[in-house]
Regions:
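Conserved phosphotransfer cores of two-component systems
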Residues: 67-69, 93-100, 121
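Non-catalytic signal-transmission and effector/linker regions of two-component phosphorelay proteins
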Residues: 1-36, 43, 132-150
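Conserved phosphotransfer microenvironments
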Residues: 76-92
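Alpha4 helix (beta4-alpha4-beta5 surface) of REC/receiver domains from two-component response regulators
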Residues: 87, 107-127, 138
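Conserved active-site segment of CheY-like receiver
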Residues: 34, 78, 106-110, 130
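Alpha-helical interaction/dimerization surfaces of two-component signaling modules
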Residues: 44-46, 65, 117, 139
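Two-component/phosphorelay signaling modules centered on CheY-like receiver
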Residues: 35-54
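Acidic, metal-coordinating helix/loop segments flanking the phosphotransfer/catalytic sites
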Residues: 55-73
Length: 150
């Protein structure tokens, strides 16, 4: 593996390619990010793509929204869950519906979440700040553009 690939993976990576399930007309994305401006910016861009989006800034609300609103994609600011060792995400991974849900880690530049730790926690993709929001928007749009059929 070249050092260039490793450098890129530490900034942006997609480890598991997923597609939204066919038959679910709603396309819901939950943005869980402490920084209001980042969350709002992503929300605007994703809504322009025709997606339903909610932005939440705390893990308690995120937990409730995951259960009640059942988003197909979750963009999670890792600082909301890293102190617990990603207990929220690991618990979410045990949910039977998770194979069809896109889980994206949005981490800060410092302290840096180790890429392997994010993979082990169960994230499908990773974007480290300062990550261009268009990369996340493209990733989410691709998830919804080619539905998964069973």
């Amino acid at each position: 593996m070249s050092s260039r690939f490793v450098d890129n993976e530490s900034e942006f990576a997609l480890w598991r390619v997923k597609r939204a399930r066919v038959g679910d007309a709603s396309r819901r994305v939950l943005i869980a990010h402490k920084d209001k401006s980042i969350g709002d910016s992503l929300a605007v861009q994703l809504r322009q793509k025709g997606l339903q989006v909610i932005h939440s800034q705390d893990l308690k609300s995120v937990r409730a929204l995951v259960q009640s609103w059942q988003p197909q994609a979750l963009l999670l600011d890792t600082s909301l869950d890293s102190d617990s060792g990603y207990v929220f995400l690991r618990t979410l991974r045990m949910d039977a519906d998770v194979p069809g849900r896109l889980l994206v880690a949005m981490s800060n530049v410092w302290p840096a979440d180790p890429v392997q730790t994010l993979k082990d926690a169960g994230f499908d993709a990773h974007c480290r700040r300062p990550c261009a929001t268009w990369r996340i928007v493209d990733l989410v749009e691709a998830f919804f553009s080619t539905p998964f059929t069973r």
